[in-house]
Structures are given as C-alpha cells and as structure tokens.
Amino acid sequence: MNLHEYQSKKLFADYGLPVTKGYVCENVEQALSAIEKLSGSQWIAKCQIHAGGRGKAGGVKVVKSAQEVRSFFTKFLGQRLVTVQTNEQGQPIHQIYLEPCAEIQKELYLSAIIDRSSQRIVFMASSEGGMDIEEVAEKTPHLLHRVTIDPLVGAMPYQGRELAFKLGLSGKQIQQFSQIFCQLAKLFVEKDLSLLEINPLVILKNDELFCLDAKVVVDDNALYRHPDLFSMRDLTQEDPREAEAEKWNLNYVALDGNIGCMVNGAGLAMGTMDIIKLHGGRPANFLDVGGGATKERVMEAFKIILTDSAVKAVLVNIFGGIVRCDLIAKGIVSAINEIGVSVPVIVRLEGTNADLGCEILAQSNLNLIAVNSLTEAAEQAVNAAKESE
C-alpha cells in the first residue's frame, strides 16, 4: 500500500526525522489559509498522487504569491496528472501539499528496500540526489552505495557513518546522517514497510540534513497489524478493478494488453501470461482466483476482467487440484449468461472433474472455445483477440 508524501512525512516526524511543517489542502481556501501559517515568502506546492515524476510533469512548483497559489490549485485540483510512472489516464489529484521552500546546498539520495536474494533489508545511498535512481545505477553505478542490515542486530550506527563517509559528508553531518539512517531502519521494521525512499535528502545552507521528499510503501500482507496505516489508504489512487477484486479475495493486477486471463494459482497465472506473449499476444491482466475458487468468485472474476474495454478475448486456464473444474465451468456459464459476454472465451480445464466441466461447457450452447492444451489455448486466444480488433 502506497502512502502520500504528506502521510509519509507524518511518519517521519513521529520517528524524529527532520521534515518541514506543511499543510495538505483540498481547496483554494485551505491553501490561502496555509500560506499565512507557513514561514517564508515562497512555498512549494506538490500534487499528491501515488506516482513519481511529478516534478517533470508540472505537478511540483515554487509558488511566490497568493495569486500563484490560487492559479496552481485551480489548474490541478480535480484533474489527473500524467507522469512517466502512470498510465495514459494519469492519477487523480484531490489534495495538494504546501510547505516552505528550503535553501538547498546539495541533494543526496537514500532508500531502503527488501532484497529478495539476500532476504535482508538493504539501504542504498548516492551523492546524486534528485535524479531517477535507475539512471544513476545505469550510468554511474560507482556512485550508488549499499549497506545490508543484519536482522539479528539491526541497523548499526557505524553502518550509517560508513555511508556518510562515502557520500562525502563531514563534521556534524556524519552523526546526523547516522541518526537518520538508524531511525529509518527502525521505522522500516516496526511498520512492516517494503520500500522507503528519500529523494532528495538535502544538505541545507546551514549544513543540516533534511528530508525534502518522502516515499513509503507498506507491505499489504502486514496491514492487519497496522490499523493506523490502513486508515491512510487512498482508494482513489488505486485501480477500481483491483480494489473490487480484493473484496472477493482475488489477486488482480491490471496490465495494458487485450487478452483477459483467469487462472488458479500465481505460478500458473504467470506461465499463462508468458505463453500468451510467446505466441504474440498481450495479457490484459494477472488474475489468480486461488485454490478455493467458487462459482461466485469466478463470476466476479469475469465481471472484473470485462470492465476493461481493451479486452478482446478471455483465456480461462484452470488446473483442478483443490478446486473442482465442474464448479469453475458452472461459474463461467453463469457469468456469461448474467453479464452477456460479447468477446470470445477460450477455456482450458485440466484435473479434478475436468471431463464433467467440459461437458457442462458443451451443454451450455454458449460461444465458448474449449481446448485441451495450454499451447492451443494461447494460440486460440491470440487469434481471437486479433480477429476482434
């Protein structure tokens, strides 16, 4: 689950990290009231969306007067911001964050992620802050420094000092950086985060370190332990299909293709998408109905897939281990009868009660294409999608 910048900074402040006092505003009146409370004669206005690249898209701007604040809010509030990290529709803007401008001497980069290969938390830091870290890693990898956290002892101050030296910090900055490093590690573990990023972490003109930006992603699987974080969830920033799928315990991820996929099991779902790509097709989604799929869940899965107007064909690939293929078949028939599916549906059933499931599909007199192998299913789906365009 992603947090907005202002929510992330609230977390940072709770852990004693250096952040400015800002105000999140939902209308022009709140914004004009906020700048009266903020210090300085110019401020930063930041559109709050769950995506990076806001600055390059115009969603972050220095505003120097009440009129500029009014113009910025009028232009962006209620609109959608398209960045390099969003789709072509962009993300809706319902809130804008206002904070004082900072006098910056230098920009740094600091983040923490879970490294799957080492199964440890890894901190990454660079003297090239304010840039896309992927670009730094590609063009100047020697400027990206890493520290791995031992889960038995946690983050140690000496590790923070080592990073500080590599970043070229000196004097009191080293001690301050080490404190920031240790507190971020504590925050990461205690709040069950999967990603934490400060870009940029700046050195101010007074030589103090400051968290100018904040990005936090919470592990969805741990949200039950953090009702305070779950209450921060902004459903307007999420794909409505993914939110609806979550209600039915369906694992759904929207993609940009035209072949809808409904599969049981994450591994089989990924394999299905791979074989669609292998035959020249483009998956429209990842959808795992799970091992305990029921007729009702299959119906809802169909509804969710077909809310995507880009879908030109649907491939159903079910291996009946725990789940019974006849129940899946009944769900498919019920869904098509209820929704009125107009795109070709290719079905491959294998495993428990597969023959009975195929018989149910055959007796339905619906426009279903039943196949025996995954290769044939992919070929049929790709061809059907091309013919429907």
UniProtKB/Swiss-Prot annotation:
Binding site residues for ATP: K46, G53, R54, G55, E99, A102, E107
EC number annotated for this UniProt entry: 6.2.1.5
Protein's pathway: Carbohydrate metabolism; tricarboxylic acid cycle; succinate from succinyl-CoA (ligase route): step 1/1
Keyword list, A-Z: ATP-binding, Ligase, Magnesium, Metal-binding, Nucleotide-binding, Tricarboxylic acid cycle
Positions contributing to Mg(2+) binding: N199, D213
Record's catalysed reaction(s): succinate + ATP + CoA = succinyl-CoA + ADP + phosphate; GTP + succinate + CoA = succinyl-CoA + GDP + phosphate
Complex formation: Heterotetramer of two alpha and two beta subunits.
Annotated NCBIfam families: PRK00696.1 (NF001913), sucCoAbeta (TIGR01016)
This protein's name: Succinate--CoA ligase [ADP-forming] subunit beta
Lineage, highest ranks first: Bacteria, Pseudomonadati, Pseudomonadota, Gammaproteobacteria, Pasteurellales
Chain's gene name: sucC
